[in-house]
């Protein structure tokens, strides 16, 4: 079991999974964006710069000690990316956690907010 993390020192990454292009955003607990709506290809070649974008934010912002990545579980489109990021040597020092979420639950959660 993993230890609890301090959310104030966590970079939160969201990835919208699609068949050809994924879209990534990253923000902190106070909702300050560090990556906003950046498209990346759904290929091995696209996963490398995506990993690099996250690693660059972590390098440039020493307040981050952890990274939490959330992505939609859309069949096989995101499986390889989830495995790649969870095994990343660049992200490993930040206790990376990758979660695949049910898209219906994400949609219903989003409906509970007026300003999203």
Question: What residue spans do the PLM features occupy?
Answer:
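Phosphate- and other anionic-substrate recognition elements at nucleic-acid/protein interfaces
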Residues: 1-116
